[in-house]
Amino acid sequence: MPRDPSIKKVLLIGSGPIQIGQAAEFDFSGSQACRALREEGVSVVLVNSNPATIQTDPDMADVTYVEPLQADIIAKIIKKEKPDGILSGMGGQTGLNLTAELAEMGALEGVKILGTPLKAIYEGEDREKFRDLMNRIGEPVPRSVIVSSLDQLEHAASVVGFPAIIRPAYTLGGAGGGIAYNLDELRRIVELGLGKSRIHQVLIEESVAGWKEIEFEVMRDANDTCITICGMENVDPMGVHTGESVVVAPILTLRDDEFHLLRNAALKIIRALDVQGGCNIQFAFKGDDEYRVIEVNPRVSRSSALASKATGYPIARVASKIAIGLRLDEILNTVTGKTPASFEPSIDYVVVKVPRWPFDKFKTADRTLTTAMKSTGEVMAIGRCVEEAFLKALRSLDTDVEHHTVLSELKMILSRPTDERFGALFDALRQGMTLNEIAEITRITPFWLEKIQNIVEMEKALTAHPDDATILKAKEFGFSDLEIAQYSGKDVSEVESKVGLPVYKMVDTCAAEFPAQTPYFYSTYGDKVCEVTHSDRKKVMILGSGPIRIGQGIEFDYCTVHAVTALREDGYEVHVVNNNPETVSTDFDTSDRLFFEPMTLEDVSHILQKDDYYGVMVQFGGQNAVNLAVPLKNEIDRLNLKTRILGTTPDAMDMAEDRDRFSVLLDSLSIPTPPNGSAYSEQEAYATAERIGYPVLVRPSYVLGGRAMEIVHDDTELATYMREAVRVSKSHPVLIDRFLQNAIELDVDAVCDGTDVIIGGIMEHIETAGVHSGDSACVIPPQSLSPEILADVRDYTRKIALGLGVVGLVNIQFAVQGSTVYVLEANPRASRTVPFVAKSVGIPLAKIAARVMMGERLADMPYKEIEVSHVAVKEVLLPFNKLPGVDTVLGPEMKSTGEVMGIDYDFGRAYYKASIAAHNRLPKSGNVFISVTDDLKDQILQVAKTFTENGLSIYATSGTVEFFAERGITANLVRKIAEGSPNVLDMLRAGEISLIINNFADKQSRHDHQQIMRVAVDYGTPYITTLQAAVAAAEAINSVREENLTIEPLQHYIGR
């Protein structure tokens, strides 16, 4: 049947900021949905708060609202836009929760809920309704009890027993859940889970930890045609969230009858839910036909992004078309260009997904993996065998693996699921543990352990007898040339000459049964036939950014996609190399050719040798891609390839990173920089710090996201840093700068063609120097800087860009102290603020940069710096609610996972929007707790006065109450933590505090601060830790009480 003609306009809800449990997969699915709906003549209204996404580009939807994802705000958009339907399943858990809220408040009268019906949302997300539905259709679920209060826990424990699994209703990435082994743990987890749940409901169920975890991605249309897209198997057994597990496709350890038993159950469940579109169903499987249905995601999910990339089947595109009435057999599979979407995909290769965890950033975090997610991103690898896919995935992670050789230590690591366990499996086998021993400790299916044992045996074979046959077999297993050289004792070039280049095979949805129109490729040594074809068009390779991690997020995928789009519009053939299954850049039709490969020198150079490339672009893929620039140039020269690094030269990139060279450049341009130096040893560091004067900012060179960056105040702290935080070498010194206290920091993003410079935007940070720029809120245009200061910033930006020889993007960070503008650093590459600037001012910086890198001149383009009449604020999302044990104090090392944008016509309202979009809802009524250091009390006075004038009550400890009283402000007394209860922690737990403003000066106040922040995070109370943010919050609260928020589309602000 044709699409529903009554659906002319659809509201699509995005997923908001990148956070643990909800990453870039929803930008990929939402962007695909926008294109699919518009192909059918449907007008799309998009609402999403995340400026770093492709879907919030002004050209992606017909109307784009970059607004907080709050039901009351979306209700106003619905009233204004009058959509015929709402599509919630592309916005992850956020989209489903908001749709349910909107329906409950009556905002969806006359608006059709598309794809996932309201009944399916309730039955999929409400744990009690889901259990009842499964019982009705005869599908087994774990024994369980639903609780909505702590009084019910003893009864629940008596029914379920221990260990018990806790699953809150309507939460993201298992948030608020976990595994309890006794009543005290059960009480602690359930108390948090009830607070996280939208309906204050938690399921406590019997543990099936140790069973196999199997997932099916299924699709259904209005005609009741159902297909399975992909079956996936978790290497980790039940007890670890699927987002935290190593996952393999296709399912390899079930017999055919077992596979069809679960497949049939999955189809039965999607029919019972009446979902029209995609659905993810998770099973626990014990064997002997015994299984349990664990949960259903009646929407596009992280697993569906993986299934889509693993098979080539465009799940979000097909689900969007089904949502407006099309049948599966009426939708064309755009990968083959011939088959209908009703054909089930088949694959003739092995896909492995491995999560990327942030524990390299958070040393104190609890690394235990449970039913609540902690990873920030993931990589995907494809091979002809499990061993090859495993090793390519591990190579893609780009993490340092700590090896263990002590058996007692290994057994302890294996006994508890952590991020270290998968790597420890290899070490355990190297140390002689048997498969049975390891299987007994870990409950991992022996099949997977056998594959790892094959890899370990190959390591031994390479060492013992590295003949040609052994080396070739190692390549089939996925070993890199460098690894083979290390094990065999041979030179890398000798290995290269023996094994040659890999072949490249297609991912085409149909196991090569039909020719593919838009294929993507993976390398293998397990086949002889190469499926890459050649064209005569001018080809450019663009390196993507790999897995999402703190410091390198979706912003770089945005830049990659914009560069691809610009070059394809100009007629170039564009090839992308990336390994992240969540992203738009790895969508089947983003580039002319996609290589799903590790982002290493060897893997990239292999691709370059397979075709004639005009050039390679590294500056859009973040620090990892930029770090490849110099070695890749050397490799191109060594192999005598007819290609080049496009844009800014590797030497210019090195000049910006090399502190000594960069300082010489700034001196020659008469541009001020804080006193600084480089240290190649501990003694040099002491001497440099003494010359500069404490406090100093110390950091390693060539890193992203401020990794291992600290402010140190004396020799003792510096000694600790040099011995514990960094490894200094002759090629990687420690950089030491005078720390500019109370300075205002600025970021500038610009494009340079070697002759001219266009400034995209000047961003003023809300927080002062000392907080990493990636963790600071920032605003366009600057709010507190004089025209003279801004003129200096513009002048220095042009001089530095031209002095470095930038061709493409450049980001420069400044600090303003008094009337002096200091340059902190310059990064001649894409930055994490490029998407925010582009959305704020309407200039497509990444597209302009890509064209400049191909030789176009800025003078021939219709762009210039724009003065905007509105205000845009970028705020960050911090992961503390997902990572117990993490220090919540902000500093020079980046901790945020994502960002949001608030846009309005004054700073207060824009900041208010950004705050609530970042889940830090500023109160219009209630109690504010203020506890700041003595040096800030005079400055916090006006903040407190503004709060009281707006009807908020102030709570503080004795010293602050007295200080306020002497100055005419009434504050209520609350005990210090050390003075016992009732104190601020008790008030937070009781829900009596609406906002926390707290900083610290010494070890005791820092300890108190950490306790307050941890309870505030656990109970969802907004908190502020800097004076500047408190001032901004007061202005925001005052502004929204005086005037309503402006709800207008992005196109309205930027004149589209």
Swiss-Prot record:
Region (Allosteric domain): 922-1056
Catalysis: reaction(s): hydrogencarbonate + L-glutamine + 2 ATP + H2O = carbamoyl phosphate + L-glutamate + 2 ADP + phosphate + 2 H(+)
Domain MGS-like positions: 920-1056
Residue segments, region Carbamoyl phosphate synthetic domain: 533-921
Binding site for Mg(2+) 1: 282, 295
Matching InterPro entries: ATP-grasp, ATP_grasp_subdomain_1, CarbamoylP_synth_lsu, CarbamoylP_synth_lsu_oligo, CarbamoylP_synth_lsu_oligo_sf, CbamoylP_synth_lsu-like_ATP-bd, CbamoylP_synth_lsu_CPSase_dom, MGS-like_dom
Binding locations of Mn(2+) 3: 813, 825
Gene Ontology molecular functions: ATP binding; carbamoyl-phosphate synthase (ammonia) activity; carbamoyl-phosphate synthase (glutamine-hydrolyzing) activity; metal ion binding
Domain ATP-grasp: residue ranges: 131-324, 663-854
Binding site for Mg(2+) 4: 825, 827
Residues that bind Mn(2+) 2: 295, 297
UniProt entry tagged with the keyword Methyltransferase: no
A GO cellular-component term linked to this record: cytoplasm
Cited NCBIfam families: CPSaseII_lrg, PRK05294.1, PRK12815.1
Similarity field: Belongs to the CarB family.
Protein's name in the database: Carbamoyl phosphate synthase large chain
Biological source species: Methanospirillum hungatei JF-1 (strain ATCC 27890 / DSM 864 / NBRC 100397 / JF-1)
Organism classification: Archaea, Methanobacteriati, Methanobacteriota, Stenosarchaea group, Methanomicrobia
Gene that produces this protein: carB
